[in-house]
Curated annotation (Swiss-Prot):
An example Gene Ontology molecular-function term: structural constituent of ribosome
Family: Belongs to the universal ribosomal protein uS15 family.
Annotated GO CC locations: cytosolic small ribosomal subunit
Task performed by this protein: One of the primary rRNA binding proteins, it binds directly to 16S rRNA where it helps nucleate assembly of the platform of the 30S subunit by binding and bridging several RNA helices of the 16S rRNA.
Alphabetical keyword list: Ribonucleoprotein, Ribosomal protein, RNA-binding, rRNA-binding
Organism the protein comes from: Halalkalibacterium halodurans (strain ATCC BAA-125 / DSM 18197 / FERM 7344 / JCM 9153 / C-125) (Bacillus halodurans)
Alphabetized HAMAP family for the sequence: Ribosomal_uS15_B
Protein name, UniProt field: Small ribosomal subunit protein uS15
Pfam assignment, any one: Ribosomal_S15
Complex and partners: Part of the 30S ribosomal subunit. Forms a bridge to the 50S subunit in the 70S ribosome, contacting the 23S rRNA.
Length: 89
């Protein structure tokens, strides 16, 4: 259910803004999106797993806050990220 370190490194390399970037909003949103998608698949088969559902809702809220921050800070970076991830915003 959790991301492997290799997959996380792939995401970081794809979305990083500079060489040692691991914590920019783009990277954080991309990692959260991957975790959310994985958890969604888990919850499709395990409908009564309410503990994981709560974790999913917390991740979605955190991603929403990061996207709002990025939209307020730099709209072009926000739009590029949303297009690249295929989010509905």
């Amino acid at each position: 259910m959790a991301l492997t370190q290799e997959r996380k490194n792939e995401i970081i390399n794809e979305f990083k803004t500079h060489e040692n970037d691991t914590g920019s909003p783009e990277v954080q949103v991309a990692i959260l999106t991957e975790q959310i998608n994985t958890l969604n698949e888990h919850l499709r088969t395990h409908k009564k797993d309410h503990h994981s559902r709560r974790g999913l809702l917390k991740m979605v809220g955190q991603r929403r806050n990061l996207l709002t921050y990025l939209r307020n800070k730099d709209v072009t970076r926000y739009r590029n990220l949303v297009d690249k991830l295929g989010l509905r915003r």
